[in-house]
Amino acid sequence: MVQNFIHLPEHRQCVLHLYRHTLRNSKQCCHSQHLINRIKKITRQTIVKHRYDKSSWSVHFYLQKLYELNHLLIQRDVKTVWNLLTDVSKSKSKSKSKKSSTRSSRILKALQDIHQLKQDKGLQDPQIVREKLILNNYIKREQARNHLPRFIPEEYKTKLLLPLALHTVAMARLNSIHGKLVEGPPKVFLTHTTPMGHRIWFVRSAFNKKKRQSKTLGILIRREKNEGHKRWDYLRQCKSNAYWAQQEANWEQLIENKIVPQFDLNRYLDSQSIGKKKIECPPQLAHWLEPIGYSIQKLNQINADKAAYFRNYKNRVLLNGGQALYFENKSITMYQRRVKRFQQMVQNDLPYVVPFFPGRDLLSTLTKYRF
């Protein structure tokens, strides 16, 4: 008996993969939200409509169309994509489809013209966008101080004010560099992060902060935090279970002896911490509470062992092992090299900086000396 393709796992997996790729490619390769929505709508309608087809030719035809659609999206041929969607879609009449295609073609052409106009003006270049932002901020600031008129010709902005604006930004950068050099070598210090129950100590310096932090250290911190949260959840679960265990024990004693034992459960659970005096559990409740108390002791012992390990690591490796000293010496060496480069820049190039000459402006000079 012929079976529907929807019941074949390999076929379902293939169709789902193609559908996901289509949605992903439409968002990455299309700039029109209208086209993205149309791709999603028609693709989903076609897949749902033909999911019970028994004809291998029909299934093969629509799979080929879906593959062709992904290929056109990667090539960014949006006009052909639109026409392909129009051909596949059966919900509209021919006249309506033709009218919609003509109208959408005009919209697509207008969008493409706008995109091309932006590219011709260079608005997509990050460097030009950054320079225009600096120039606009400079003009607003100077106009607020009544140093510039309200109307400024574009030629003056590009040839006169833009170099001055970039020079102002470079001067602020130069003053920042000088201030940091006056402060001395970058500080090297021990810091810590606090997972549940202990501290992880590590060295922080200019060489291993933010994105330059060791990947191994980041993995260690995330792992310890996850494990610490799990142990904390286990402790809370143990205390919750202890309450119900006490109720079960009280029920047993009430049935057997017609009495309810008086016992401070919170005090007993707190005594299971490391370093505290243990409170003995009454014989009537021991069968229920001692296993939970043992679990709490083991979890607290793991926390104490972790804290002792990282405390010893701080003293053995970071302080006495020379890791902090290594980063301190490295910071001093880096600082001395920066001071030497700064002095060379001040002596050789800084007196001859001219904002209006490319290559001799302050930004180029700072880049030359790696500042």
Curated annotation (Swiss-Prot):
What does the UniProt keyword field contain?
Mitochondrion
Query: GO cellular component annotations, sorted alphabetically?
Result: mitochondrion
Q: Where in the cell is it found?
A: Mitochondrion
Q: Does the keyword Mitochondrion apply?
A: yes
Q: Where is it mostly found?
A: mitochondrion
Identify the domain of life. Eukaryota
Instruction: State the similarity comment.
Output: Belongs to the RRG1 family.
Q: What does this protein do?
A: Essential for respiratory growth and required for mitochondrial protein synthesis. Required for vacuolar acidification.
Q: What is this protein called?
A: Required for respiratory growth protein 1, mitochondrial
